[in-house]
Regions:
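Short, thiol/selenol-centered motifs that function as redox-active sites or metal-ligating centers
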Residues: 35, 57-66
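C-terminal binding/interaction regions
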Residues: 1-22, 28, 77-80, 84-158
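Structured beta-strand/loop patches that form or line metal/cofactor-binding pockets in enzymes
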Residues: 10, 18-47, 54
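Glycine/charged-rich beta-loop-alpha catalytic/anionic-binding loops adjacent to active sites
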Residues: 44-55, 93-102
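Alpha-helical support elements that line or immediately flank enzyme active sites
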Residues: 62-80
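Helix-adjacent hinge/juxtasegments
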Residues: 43, 51-53, 70-72, 81
Length: 158
């Protein structure tokens, strides 16, 4: 049986921010190609700041816990500040939003947290496109594959 830490179990049993946002400024969906988990993310953005974030899911405990933590941590964040620095710095900043809270994730489940960050970038890219911020939108889209690459490098170190 897969052993999960108490933080992951807690977020799975009582996930935060589950639901939809009516008329979201940003929305994205992802189907994890590794396991089939699905996450949909909705963002309410005002003056370039994430005011609210909610998600719907069909997935395992780690997928749910990742989205629960991420939607809590992303609130109040200024979008432009999230993208300051090199691609590696931006990826690390976004990954840290869940990693620091969830603790150790079983190696067999390391494919779950990247999906949450990827769906966030997809949601933000949609918002930035509507706002006419094409350069920042392109950067958000270009970071999506780098999230999984980041996690794969971590797996190789173990």
């Amino acid at each position: 049986m897969l052993e999960l830490n108490e933080k992951i179990k807690g977020h799975f049993r009582n996930p935060q921010n589950v639901g939809e946002i009516e008329n979201p400024e940003g929305m994205g969906a992802i189907n994890n190609p590794v396991c089939g988990d699905t996450t949909k993310l909705y963002l309410k953005i005002k003056n370039g700041v994430v005011e609210d974030a909610k998600f719907l899911f069909f997935g395992c405990a780690v997928t749910v816990a990742s989205a629960s933590v991420f939607t809590q941590k992303i609130r109040g964040k200024e979008i432009s500040k999230l993208f300051l620095g090199t691609d590696e710095e931006v990826v690390r900043r976004l990954v840290n939003l869940t990693e620091s809270e969830l603790g150790e994730i079983p190696p067999i489940k390391l494919h779950c947290p990247p999906a949450t960050v990827e769906v966030f970038l997809e949601s933000i890219a949609g918002y930035l496109g509507k706002e006419g911020k094409i350069e920042l939108r392109s950067r958000a889209k270009s970071l999506i594959p780098k999230i999984s690459e980041y996690y794969k490098r971590g797996e190789e170190k173990e």
